[in-house]
């Protein structure tokens, strides 16, 4: 039986009490919770119910009766349609406060830990919270008689929103994407049709090294074929000298994953170079690298502040990617070991260590939850562990391994407060949360990165 007093299509007044973990406003109508994208804490609004469930209602904003002083005009022309950003309508100082609150909400919802007893610091923001993303992944679509569009899927949909410019992207990523889009149209290259499963070019991926100026272009295709390849490569080489690597990745799966397993070189180098904290890193097409290079140094500085190192410690860099975090600490410890499931990332990590003259690192391909226990069985016990997992959080097998290994210091770098809270509840059996430091890696969005220092409890 539906206990919700709201009916679909119903319009009603609402006061927004707080904002949720996805950046939406939250209010209560006859004690039933209502989620309203685009509404801000303190606003009095009129909304229309669009989706009614037993325990909650999703509504759209119809009218603002009392506006928040933190409301600003979103500068992006496709902000409401695109779904890539959730907070452009919120003043930046208020975005930073919200992100700290999102961490608190996650602790409240997913653990029995009292967040008022935790030291949750104010969010570290950016001086200029625009044009920060070093990588774009724009889908392609054919419209009308041969016109090619590139853009992002709208929020919770597979409707492509055409994007001519994106104000959170590094300008070169947009410049290259638009140039390639026009080439695809000019040469009539077949564009992937999701419903029919036909066509060739699915996605245009561009990543740039902000410190080096090197840029990589990846054609994500539905087959190994790429018609008019020679002509397009010649035009790209002539017009875009900043593009130093052109790759093709084949993804034939009917899924939302961008990359497939097969990647090969079309022109230039296999990877691009980026610099971070006085180190140099090679980035291959599928390798993970932080999307906001400006804030990455701030993030790693917070990790550095969290760890107390004398130089005699052994350190594990779990989910190591191309080795950035571990190599930043290699000069401060006796040995660093890292693991990652993507073979290309481990190849990059090894090459990066060699390039940076770092000899006290060891890397292995594999899942963290498999590799760490293996190392322990071989007699290696880390004094400190850094985990920087994907949005899904730490695998439960890794949590068990961490609890078994009992490293004195554990730093958790999270990109998802919900899975962070879930993992902290499990780690709390043996670890004490010293503090949590939110870092804004993705201004204008509801995403928040958090550095958490955990210390082994005294027995």
From Swiss-Prot:
Cited InterPro entries: MeTrfase_TrmA_AS, MeTrfase_TrmA_CS, NA-bd_OB-fold, SAM-dependent_MTases_sf, TRAM_dom, U5_MeTrfase_fam
Pfam families: TRAM, tRNA_U5-meth_tr
GO biological process: rRNA base methylation
Keywords: 4Fe-4S, Iron, Iron-sulfur, Metal-binding, Methyltransferase, S-adenosyl-L-methionine, Transferase
CDD domains, sorted: AdoMet_MTases
SUPFAM superfamilies xrefs: Nucleic acid-binding proteins, S-adenosyl-L-methionine-dependent methyltransferases
Recorded superkingdom: Bacteria
Residue ranges constituting the TRAM domain according to the UniProt record: 5-63
Residue positions binding S-adenosyl-L-methionine: 290, 319, 340, 388
Location of the active site: 415 (nucleophile)
Binding sites annotated in the UniProt record for [4Fe-4S] cluster: 76, 82, 85, 166
One GO MF term: rRNA (uridine-C5-)-methyltransferase activity
Known EC number: 2.1.1.-
NCBIfam families named among the record's database cross-references: rumA
Family assignment from sequence similarity: Belongs to the class I-like SAM-binding methyltransferase superfamily. RNA M5U methyltransferase family.
Protein name: Uncharacterized RNA methyltransferase LMOf2365_1727
The organism's taxonomic lineage, starting at the top: Bacteria, Bacillati, Bacillota, Bacilli, Bacillales
């Amino acid at each position: 039986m539906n206990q919700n007093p709201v009916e679909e299509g119903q319009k009603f007044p609402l006061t927004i009490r707080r904002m949720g973990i996805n950046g939406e406003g939250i209010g209560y109508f006859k004690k039933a919770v209502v989620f309203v994208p685009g509404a801000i804490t303190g606003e009095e609004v009129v909304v229309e119910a669009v989706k009614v469930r037993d325990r909650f209602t999703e509504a759209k904003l119809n009218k603002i009766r009392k506006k928040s002083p933190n409301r600003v005009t979103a500068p992006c022309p496709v902000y409401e349609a695109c779904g890539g950003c959730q907070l452009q309508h919120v003043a930046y100082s208020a975005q930073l406060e919200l992100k700290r609150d999102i961490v608190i909400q996650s602790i409240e919802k997913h653990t029995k830990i009292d967040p008022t007893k935790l030291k949750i610091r104010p969010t570290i923001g950016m001086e200029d919270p625009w044009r920060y993303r070093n990588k774009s992944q724009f889908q392609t679509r054919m419209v009308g008689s041969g016109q090619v569009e590139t853009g992002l899927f709208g929020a919770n949909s597979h409707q492509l929103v055409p994007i001519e410019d994106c104000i959170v992207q590094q300008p070169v990523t947009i410049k290259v994407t638009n140039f390639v889009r026009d080439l695809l149209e000019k040469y009539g290259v077949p564009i992937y049709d999701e419903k029919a499963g036909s066509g060739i070019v699915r996605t245009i991926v561009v990543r740039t090294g902000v410190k080096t100026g090197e840029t990589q272009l990846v054609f994500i295709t539905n087959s190994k074929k790429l018609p008019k390849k020679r002509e397009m490569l010649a035009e790209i080489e002539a017009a875009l000298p900043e593009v130093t690597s052109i790759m093709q990745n084949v993804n034939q799966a009917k899924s939302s994953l961008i990359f497939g397993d097969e990647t090969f070189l079309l022109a230039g180098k296999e990877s691009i170079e980026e610099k971070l904290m006085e180190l140099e890193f090679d980035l291959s097409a599928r390798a993970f690298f932080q999307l906001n290079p400006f804030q990455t140094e701030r993030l790693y500085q917070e990790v550095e502040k969290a760890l107390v190192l004398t130089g005699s410690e052994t350190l594990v860099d779990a989910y190591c990617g191309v080795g950035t975090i571990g190599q930043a600490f290699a000069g401060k410890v006796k040995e660093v070991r890292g693991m990652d499931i993507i073979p290309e990332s481990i190849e990059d990590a090894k090459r990066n260590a060699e390039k940076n003259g770092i000899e006290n690192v060891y890397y292995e391909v594999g899942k963290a939850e498999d590799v760490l226990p293996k190392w322990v069985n071989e007699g290696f016990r880390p004094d400190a562990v850094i985990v920087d997992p994907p949005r899904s959080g730490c695998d439960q097998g890794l949590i068990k391994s961490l609890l078994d290994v009992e490293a004195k210091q554990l730093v958790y770098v999270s990109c998802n407060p919900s899975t962070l809270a879930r993992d902290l509840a499990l780690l709390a059996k043996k670890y004490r949360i010293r503090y949590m430091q939110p870092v804004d890696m993705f201004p204008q969005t509801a995403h928040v990165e958090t550095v958490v220092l955990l210390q082994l409890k005294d027995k």
